[in-house]
Amino acid sequence: MALAASFNMTNPQPAIEGGISEVEIISQQVDEETKSIAPVQLVNFAYRDLPLAAVDLSTAGSQLLSNLDEDYQREGSNWLKPCCGKRAAVWQVFLLSASLNSFLVACVILVVILLTLELLIDIKLLQFSSAFQFAGVIHWISLVILSVFFSETVLRIVVLGIWDYIENKIEVFDGAVIILSLAPMVASTVANGPRSPWDAISLIIMLRIWRVKRVIDAYVLPVKLEMEMVIQQYEKAKVIQDEQLERLTQICQEQGFEIRQLRAHLAQQDLDLAAEREAALQAPHVLSQPRSRFKVVEAGTWEEETAAESVVEELQPSQEAMVKDDMNSYISQYYNGPSSDSGVPDAAVCMVTTAAIDIHQPDISSDLFSLDMPLKLGGNGTGATSESASRSSVTRAQSDSSQTLGSSTDCSTAREEPSSEPGPSPLPLPPQQQVEEATVQDLLSSLSEDPCPSQRALDPAPLSRPSPAGSAQTSPELEHRVSLFNQKNQEGFTVFQIRPVIHFQPTVPVLEDKFRSLESKEQKLHRVPEA
């Protein structure tokens, strides 16, 4: 009951509908947030950081739109800003694509070869029949290629903006190489025509071969950029997971604190969880047992007396069990005795050894050697009840119901199931014990009509025995002995004022002879020793 009360304590955390714990809800939120993570946008994506691969124009353009708003905030004239608005992102991807850079590298190699042939023809190191006509064609082809390079540089400045172009040093160097290659060729062509040795200055264009690096990077940087984006996504997911971990850690700390409080409460109640779990498992077996204050324990045979005997022990919790406040003590106190909350002091441990008397079959003999029934109760309502009886030998197994004789006022009975095997046969008894047995057996057979004389004694109604058939008037001596017997019984019960245990009608002549034989044993059977 204390365990149930401890678990009925107010829970600081509200219950979640549907039986779903807060931990499960947090995990679901983490999964949803992880799924809803959008591709990470590139922040401060400069021109020099763009890849040179042939990527999807729409995706790349969306990545570059965030930089345009910052570019629009630059101070200066409008011509210094990138043109075409948001469409500039498409041109940026085109100018930085791997295909365009591969084409430019091929054009550089071609113009270098053409200019070298033209120079060899002009210095007459290469002679053939139509060499001058061929040199003129080479000159114009080289001029067109250099013009294409210059147009590409102007397009870069217009699309990227003058500031981004100037900030990128490698692009400034590339533009300078193009201008230095195109300007001498144009000047020599205007001054001397296509046949001029000054066209060799245009060979400086071969410095633009560095574009090969851009082609190589076009196949490496996309993979690198993709991995960086994946890393950024994992970093963002890691931040979310760290936040959820902090929340779960806080929940675990709160639950740990609550567990410590519950354990402290259980420690104050002196409860043992392991014992309570075992008691809960054994509860069905305990509940199936009969509710009785007494249990019958079959004792072994004595060396002196080789007779089977049944010992009735009162179920009292031991001192250690009473100190230990667990579920087993609760169950045993509930079914086997009064609880400590009732205010009634527990009686002392009582051991009763007696012979079982079958009230339904009075003809069956049951041997009883001697009987001492002391009972002393103090003035404060507590006392030690001690009952001692001699061991009895049972000639056969108990019947379906058997009653034990004792001084307990609750008049409890112990039952044993009939056994199919016959009990051990008793040994011959001494003559004195046989006489005592016969005397007590006659007395008990006369009392067999009332299964619980002590309870009848506590009844306020007057007790009377029906007179047996054919009985005659009894003598005054027998009535005097019976009154002495009842008076001694009343002296034994100093606390409870009870009526005589045995009340005989004046017409009982049969018991006169029985009490005469019992006179010598009256002191032993019915005397209450001072305890």
Curated annotation (Swiss-Prot):
Domain notes: The transmembrane segment S4 functions as a voltage-sensor and is characterized by a series of positively charged amino acids at every third position. Transplantation of the transmembrane segment S4 into HVCN1, generates a functional voltage-activated proton channel.
Region (Disordered): 380-477
Compositional bias ranges of the Polar residues kind: 383-412
Recorded superkingdom: Eukaryota
Keyword annotations of the record: Cell membrane, Cell projection, Coiled coil, Disulfide bond, Membrane, Transmembrane, Transmembrane helix
Residue numbers on the Cytoplasmic membrane side: 1-102, 151-169, 221-531
Coiled coil: 231-251
Gene giving rise to this polypeptide: TMEM266
Parts of the chain on the Extracellular side: 124-129, 191-199
InterPro entries in UniProt: TMEM266 (IPR042857), Volt_channel_dom_sf (IPR027359)
Pro residues composition-biased segments: 421-431
An MF annotation (GO) of this entry: protein homodimerization activity
Function, as annotated: Voltage-sensor protein present on the post-synaptic side of glutamatergic mossy fibers and granule cells in the cerebellum. Despite the presence of a voltage-sensor segment, does not form a functional ion channel and its precise role remains unclear. Undergoes both rapid and slow structural rearrangements in response to changes in voltage. Contains a zinc-binding site that can regulate the slow conformational transition.
UniProt subunit comment: Homodimer; disulfide-linked.
Membrane topology field: Multi-pass membrane protein
Cleavable signal peptide: none
Descriptive protein name: Transmembrane protein 266
GO terms for cellular component: dendrite; perikaryon; plasma membrane
